[in-house]
A protein has these predicted regions:
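The feature captures the ABC ATPase H-loop/switch
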Residues: 141
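Catalytic cores of DNA base-excision repair glycosylases
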Residues: 190-193
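Active-site-proximal beta-strand elements of phosphoester/diester hydrolases
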Residues: 232-236
Length: 277
């Protein structure tokens, strides 16, 4: 890379929709000192040549066939009533959320996108082999886990009992970050509150992966690789929380090598880690 040039960060997304997520992610990468390039099934990259980091963005559910399951038809749990204070905040932020939905063009669905699954699995594999940093966001976190041989919970109904399920773009969900994790090193010691837009989550961890954060109900909110440098997946959407310094730190860790967690260079890479007994 030319001295002084911004690191190139590949950002994956769908062919249709996802405009708001792309715009916010692009802004987050720019604020962190990088330059984002969009990658979609219709605008793919054969490999990670010339790219210095990878963000696997949110979107459609991962095809359950990739982790050995059939598609389950899960009934969504009814959203709980919002307190009046949250209703007022939501009203104030309505113009922003309306704009984001318009930019996204296509409503979020529980469908799959086989072309995107295939593209992103290939890019993750190449990035792992090259020891490039990877940040998975929501679906991206889940796909990273699947890449390493893990499985997903296709629905969360019934898992939010003591603390009802929260679905909001605002940072209302409190999570507990594992002490000594790479994520804790990046986010710092302060309490962490995140947004919640997901309906699936990590079930069985992939090989080499560990839990980096959970919510109060025990649902996995972040994962990371135990030995490979800066492979982190988060269940929330940090690109929509750029007003929060902790969330901007995730993108800085991706862009700036000195901000990352490092491991010895002798560790195995790529599918060696997935196929190892």
């Amino acid at each position: 890379m030319t001295p002084g040039a911004r690191p190139i960060i590949g950002v994956t997304g769908p062919d249709r929709g996802g405009g708001a997520a792309w715009w916010f992610t692009r802004t987050a990468v720019w604020l962190a000192g990088g330059h984002a390039v969009r990658i979609t099934p219709r605008r793919p990259r054969a490999n990670m040549d010339g790219v210095h980091g990878l963000i696997i963005g949110g979107g459609a559910d991962v095809d359950p066939k990739l982790y050995g399951q059939e598609l389950l038809h899960v009934t969504e749990k009814k959203k709980r009533d919002e307190p009046i204070s949250m209703w007022i905040i939501g009203l104030i932020l309505f113009p922003l959320t309306w704009l984001m939905r318009k930019l996204s063009a296509v409503p979020v669905t529980s469908g799959q996108n086989a072309a995107r699954d295939e593209l992103e699995m290939r890019l993750i594999d190449d990035a792992v082999r090259r020891r490039l940093p990877i940040l998975g966001i929501c679906r991206g976190e889940q796909l990273i886990n699947v890449y390493f041989g893990g499985t997903l919970l296709q629905g969360l109904t019934g898992l939010y009992i003591e603390d009802p399920e929260i679905r909001t773009i605002l940072p209302r969900k409190r999570i507990v970050v594992e002490s000594g994790s790479c994520l804790a090193n990046v986010l710092g010691p302060r309490p962490v509150r995140v947004n919640a837009l997901h309906r699936q989550a990590i079930d069985r961890l992939g090989r080499g992966m560990r839990v980096a954060a959970r919510d109060r109900n025990g649902i996995v909110q972040a994962i990371e690789h135990e030995s490979l440098p800066m492979i982190v997946g988060v269940q929330w959407h940090p690109e929509y929380l750029l007003q929060v310094p902790q969330q901007r730190a995730l993108f800085r860790a991706l862009v700036k090598p000195q901000r990352r967690c490092h491991v010895p260079a002798s560790e195995p890479t790529g599918r060696e880690l997935v196929s190892a007994a």
